[in-house]
C-alpha cells in the first residue's frame, strides 16, 4: 500500500547496525503536515480500517492542539525529512551508551523498496546520499564524540541539533579525511567489526576534521 512503510524501533538500533524486524510496518497516511485528503479514494480499505478508530484518533493531544479540523488520520511530525533516502539514527537514551547507525530502504512484502521510517523513540538526521550517511554515522560513533554525548545526555537535546552542538562539518566527498571516514562507516555498517586500530583511526580522523588539520 502507498501509505505503509517499514518501521524502525529503538531496540533495532545498535552501533553501525539498524534494520527493521521482518513484517514491522507503520501507516504514514500523508507526505506533509496533514493527512492526505485523497486517502479515502486511493486506499479505501485503509481508510475503512482507520475509520474504526476515528474517535480515538481525534482525542490525541497533538491532533487537538495542532491539527484540529484536518483529516482525523493526520499524524504529527511528518514532512519531507520523513521520506529522506537515508537517515542517521540513534535511539532514545536511558543511560550513557550512545550508538548510531544509518538506514535507507527495505523491501516490502509486495517486493517494492520503501524508505525506512523511525518510530517516535528513534532520533534521526535525514540525508540524501549513503556516503554522507556513512560519514555522519562514523563521526558520531567515534569514541570521542559518542563518549561526550553519553556523558552529557541528560543535558543535551539529542535531536538533529546534535550536528550543530558538536559542530559536525558538512560532508564533502572531495575531502580525503571525510571520504575515508565515510568508507569506514560504510564498511562497519556492512558487518565488518572495527579493530582497535580502526577505532583509533576513527578518532584521529574526527579530530583532524574538527580541527581542520
Predicted regions mapped to residue ranges:
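Non-catalytic DNA-recognition/assembly elements of restriction-modification systems
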Residues: 45, 166-213
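Polybasic, glycine- and aromatic-enriched phosphate-binding surface used to engage nucleic acids
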Residues: 1-177
